[in-house]
């Protein structure tokens, strides 16, 4: 609120400097902040008495100066954007290497909404590839080098222009240091050499946040990207149950899963499970769930035979068992899915069989999302989106992701969980129907792996072997227009 008022003050000051002799005609009016500028906690507004302005500019300027002095200095606004690191008080809940886990927090006084974000970053499924991960990506296995503060973007941004509906929430970022898709519950032992406590880390953070204002929360949105997105599906009901057990049943727990809705499909080319990148999704999770001593939600676990709990790591299998509302954000042509399926789009144009595999992947993913009440699925080749600064630019059928989330939020306020009946002009079940990667004109730009140059949609599709020029010529239109027509 202070930031918006600072801008207002500067505009008022500059206006009155130029036109100091102008007489105000409106009387008895006040400047009232817009809905965006008001905090949801009902923060006090700062009225200006325009009745004293007419014929007395000195009085008006005195009010402006008094108001300005009562606000936080404009020059220091950006300093408050940082999230501060908090190491967990419970030292038994640790990262892979035994160092204490923690979280970053940016409080928003007066807000009763909390956004808790789970970071992504693959996983490791054996002592050998965990050792390699520790050598090359130690930040994802240890808290020892975490900075004392960090800034965030996308849905974690505190700037209204970048984060229209959640900018004023209490922001929590939980770094990923358990390498277990946020599912583990096993401490470090001499035999294993590593701890896998992802699920316990989430629980411990939630407990600590209760003492920092979460106890008065109205809504807790558990969000995550990639492995964090899958972590949301695995933990959202667990968090809801935990809060209820601790005596806070009134906190509405919801989930937002970004790029964590993977398919257990057959790879394009079958390879041995020698590393996590080429290992088939089902085999990787089957190995991992044993190695991590994973916690799987009981309601999902009951749907499968003993030893087949790994099925719960796949979104379309666990989603029907969830009691908490979940919004699913998923690219129809997710780069991580294509990677584990051994589909490589760099180098020479793809073969026909590969092209057909890619198209079929989009169809399969679309089918798994058709019964998901709240979803946003653009036909793009990308991975992760909600923490990207450009997340407001992606659209499906003319609706942006922040807008769809806001519509979902409004629907939940009416207590119609997972309803696909949209509010008038406010949809939240959105999927592209066009059949190939990047056919949505709002997709993030992609770059040539070798030259680093940005590729247009037409160039990319031609690279894949799709003759855009020929098809456009047959239709008597420009390639760009053809893509727009097909996308809409």
From Swiss-Prot:
Please tell me whether the keyword Signal is annotated for this protein. Answer: yes
Show the catalytic activity: [Wnt protein]-O-(9Z)-hexadecenoyl-L-serine + H2O = [Wnt protein]-L-serine + (9Z)-hexadecenoate + H(+)
E.C. number: 3.1.1.98
Q: Where is the signal peptide?
A: 1-20
Write out the tissue specificity statement of the associated record.
Expressed in the egg and through cleavage to gastrulation stages. Enriched in the animal (prospective ectoderm) and dorsal regions in early gastrula. Shows a dynamic expression during embryogenesis, in particular during neural induction and antero-posterior (AP) patterning.
Glycosylation: which residues?
A: 90
Task: Please provide the record's keywords in A-Z order.
Answer: Glycoprotein, Hydrolase, Secreted, Serine esterase, Signal, Wnt signaling pathway
User: Mind telling me which Pfam families this protein's record contains?
Assistant: PAE
Entries under InterPro entries matching the protein:
PAE/NOTUM
Q: What class of enzyme is it?
A: hydrolase
Which molecular-function annotations from GO does this UniProt entry contain? palmitoleyl hydrolase activity; protein-containing complex destabilizing activity
What is the annotated localization of this protein? Secreted
Q: Which family does it belong to?
A: Belongs to the pectinacetylesterase family. Notum subfamily.
Please explain the role this protein plays, according to its UniProt record. Answer: Carboxylesterase that acts as a key negative regulator of the Wnt signaling pathway by specifically mediating depalmitoleoylation of WNT proteins. Serine palmitoleoylation of WNT proteins is required for efficient binding to frizzled receptors. Functions in the prospective ectoderm and is required for neural induction.
Its protein name is Palmitoleoyl-protein carboxylesterase notum1
Biological classification of the source:
Eukaryota, Metazoa, Chordata, Craniata, Vertebrata
